[in-house]
A protein has these predicted regions:
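Active-site glycine- and acidic-residue-rich loops that bind
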Residues: 91-95, 144-157, 190-194, 220-222
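Glycine-rich phosphate-binding active-site loops on the catalytic face of alpha/beta enzymes
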Residues: 118-120, 168-179, 234-250
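Glycine-enriched alpha-helix->loop->beta-strand junction motifs that scaffold or abut catalytic
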Residues: 78-80, 108-112, 141-143, 162-170, ...
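Hydrophobic faces of well-ordered beta-strands that scaffold small-molecule active sites
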Residues: 11-18, 58-61, 81-87, 114-116, ...
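Histidine/lysine/aspartate-rich catalytic loop segments that bind and position anionic ligands
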Residues: 160-191, 202
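Alpha-helix-loop-beta-strand connector modules within alpha/beta enzyme cores
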Residues: 38-45, 67-91, 131-145, 194-212, ...
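Structured C-terminal cap/extension of enzyme domains
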Residues: 4-13, 31-32, 39-49, 55, ...
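Active-site beta->alpha loop and helix N-cap motifs at the rims of alpha/beta catalytic domains
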Residues: 37-127
Length: 266
């Protein structure tokens, strides 16, 4: 499997994402609860161990006290997977500025990379909060980590491409919900439209930094092999992919996905 340098960090071509660990199913509320019931701390650590054994060396995961604690346990027990921190905001009043605290906590906790949450990026872009983009880019650079931005809107990634000096862009194949008013995830009215994917592919082709391809399977709402075919046709040599994996569905899922990535993409 390929290894790509992103801001000086050596990252495996396929990485494991953390949405299933935190119950973000992008399907039904019942499915989300099934994920959190299954992914106890022990099962999260097992998934990370299996990822390492399969050749995955990087975890893209949420910034919260739960994930911080699991990662600390995992590293203390000898785990070596590295962490790109998904920097978020809070739902509470005034919580829209919490990204600064979560970014610093992530750096202090040992992340090697960080990126602003895709919903936050969509919201900043729609609200024209350009100062937040520039400030966050400077803080990530000052923290001596690989820094980037996720996002579901192709327009946001085009703006980032043209206006920020960063290490990577993290491009979603789909834009399931409108985040222009509220940055937080909602499982109401999600859509998985081909037109969004094709527009993002066009922007990806013009981005100069490495791109992290994510939501490649529409969070399990589209055929898996179709997603690998899209990766094959649209990932460049210096790009990687991030995939969440719910191993309750298939205990061999991590190993199988690595094999499929190697067969289709590498």
């Amino acid at each position: 499997m390929r290894v790509v340098s992103i801001g000086g960090v050596q990252v495996s071509g396929l990485c494991i994402g953390g949405n299933p660990f935190s119950g973000f199913a992008y399907q039904t509320k019942e499915r989300g609860k099934e994920m959190t019931d299954f992914y106890t701390d022990a099962m999260i650590k097992q998934a990370l161990r299996e990822s390492e054994e399969a050749g995955i060396n990087t975890f893209f995961g949420r910034t919260d006290d739960h994930i911080f604690g699991v990662l600390r346990q995992y590293w203390d027990e000898g785990g070596t997977i590295q962490w790109f921190a998904q920097v978020r905001i809070e739902r509470d009043e005034g919580g829209e500025d919490a990204w600064r605290d979560w970014l610093q906590k992530s750096i202090d906790h040992g992340c090697v990379g960080a990126y602003i949450h895709g919903g936050v990026v969509d919201n900043w872009y729609a609200s024209e909060k350009w100062d937040n983009f520039h400030e966050s880019a400077e803080l990530m650079k000052a923290g001596n980590i690989s820094g980037g931005y996720a996002g579901h809107m192709f327009g946001a990634h085009a703006w980032i491409r043209d206006n920020l000096d960063i290490d990577f862009q993290m491009c979603s194949y789909y834009n399931p919900t409108d985040r222009s008013i509220v940055a937080h995830h909602s499982d109401e009215g999600e859509k998985w439209e081909d037109v969004d994917r094709e527009a993002m592919f066009e922007v990806i082709s013009s981005i100069q930094t490495p791109v992290v391809h994510y939501k490649v399977f529409a969070a399990g709402n589209r055929p898996i092999r179709e997603g690998f075919e899209f990766m094959r046709d649209n990932m460049r040599e210096g790009d990687i992919a991030c995939v969440g994996m719910f191993t309750k569905d298939d205990p061999e899922m991590i190993r199988k996905n690595v094999s499929l990535f190697e067969a289709y993409v590498d």
